[in-house]
């Protein structure tokens, strides 16, 4: 398939509307069949559970073009498993893991022209997510949900690609003991925004967070892996 006419080597890490996304809805205790759609907009009630009580979770993975022209993803089944854990922790209905993987395959195949070519340094970012959609007032789980997958071509997450970055030891905690740090809940990332904006303002690319219980052990960074040698 012919690729889109983009400057693949100079893509930033940002959103670009592509041709298709996957949507499935949960109502009356069951998921519908789901489908690929072309409309990128989401219309919700003003009192939707995602707005009022932050019932949302997401995943992130990538599709790559190999040297021989094939399109591949790395272990989407593990993302499906982690989303299952997130849903259970947030009292959201689990989207079946086999359907999760199938939906990823569908949306990547439908947007094959948006998967960056081999050697460009870019990838197709895949964002599965689930939100509470019906009106909820009073703290309780919603009754209706929507599972979606959007895709967008992206360049490296850090400007400049795979190069050394500056990291500071943050005064903020990334996750609370016995909290939601082990899942990919949207609320976790909202709480991290102030810390990363503050780090950038001081000239650092990223934070290194210490364990919140004792603040004596390294716990994680916000958006990168690290190895001590």
Predicted regions and their residues:
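Helix-start/capping segments and mature chain N-termini
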Residues: 1-107, 136-229
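Non-catalytic, conformational "gating/processing" segments within enzyme and secreted inhibitor domains
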Residues: 110-114, 118-140, 155
């Amino acid at each position: 398939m012919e690729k889109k006419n983009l400057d693949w080597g100079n893509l930033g890490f940002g959103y670009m509307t592509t041709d298709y996304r996957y949507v499935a809805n949960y109502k009356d205790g069951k998921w519908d069949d789901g489908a690929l759609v072309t409309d990128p907009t989401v219309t919700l009630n003003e009192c939707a559970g995602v707005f009022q009580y932050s019932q949302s979770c997401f995943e992130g993975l990538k599709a790559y073009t190999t040297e021989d022209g094939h399109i591949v993803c790395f272990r989407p089944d593990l993302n499906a498993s982690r989303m299952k854990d997130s849903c259970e922790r947030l009292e959201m209905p689990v989207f079946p893991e086999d359907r999760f993987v199938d939906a990823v395959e569908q949306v990547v195949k439908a947007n094959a022209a948006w998967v960056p070519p081999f050697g460009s340094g870019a990838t197709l970012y895949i964002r599965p997510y689930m939100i509470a959609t019906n009106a909820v007032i009073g703290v309780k789980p919603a009754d209706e949900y929507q599972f979606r997958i959007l895709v967008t071509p992206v360049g490296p997450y850090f400007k400049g690609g795979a190069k050394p970055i500056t990291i500071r030891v943050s005064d903020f905690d990334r996750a609370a003991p016995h909290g939601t740090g082990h899942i990919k809940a949207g609320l976790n990332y909202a709480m991290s925004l102030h810390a990363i904006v503050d780090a950038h303002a001081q000239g650092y690319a990223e934070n290194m967070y210490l364990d919140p219980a004792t603040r004596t052990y390294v716990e994680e960074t916000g958006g990168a892996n690290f190895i001590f040698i």
